[in-house]
Amino acid sequence: EAVHAKAVAKHLGTEHTELYVSPEDAMAVIPRLATIWDEPFSDSSQIPTLLVSELARKHVTVCLSGDGGDELFCGYNRYPQGYKIWNTLEQVPNPIRQTVGSLIQVFPGAPIEYLLSFLPKRFQIPHFADRLPKLGQLVKEKSGESYYQRSVSHWKEPGNLVLGGIEPQTLFNRSEQFPKVSDFREQMMYLDSMTYLPDDILTKVD
């Protein structure tokens, strides 16, 4: 996005500052992250956020960011895409979806990924083989809420990542608190505004 940001700044005649860092620069800030955020926080974008914040602090004391706009104004591509995909899946009888999803999960993706590598780059799907198990699980989900939770989750069972780990209860586990909206896009935006936004985005910047 740097090229586009520079072009917009030039067009508007605004002051524009760029910062380019090396992998070593990024690695060097990692030991300080737990102290800065006072808690384990796994969003990798905290690293560039910290670097650009330190750059900004050399010139100003307060900055305004655009965080939160995507959740409030339907800015993420996953909202329209998830809406279309789930509406399509809902039309397929559940037994068929369960069968198809299970087949996808056991399908050997490596051969297809190898064949895709011969196609033009725009047709290639990065990490296709790794994505198949999750795709199969998405097809098998029985509700829009569970479909969305699985689509934005890195791990099916986060509690299994550490010994004795237990995933805390969240809004995703309390469907009775969901608002009564007819549009699945609004449901996704609500879930993000009540979970992802305060527990990730606004943990990183406020």
Per-region residue spans from a language model:
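Short alpha-helical scaffolding segments that buttress acidic/His motifs in well-ordered protein cores
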Residues: I30-A34, L191-S193, L197
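A short, charged helix-loop
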Residues: G165-E176
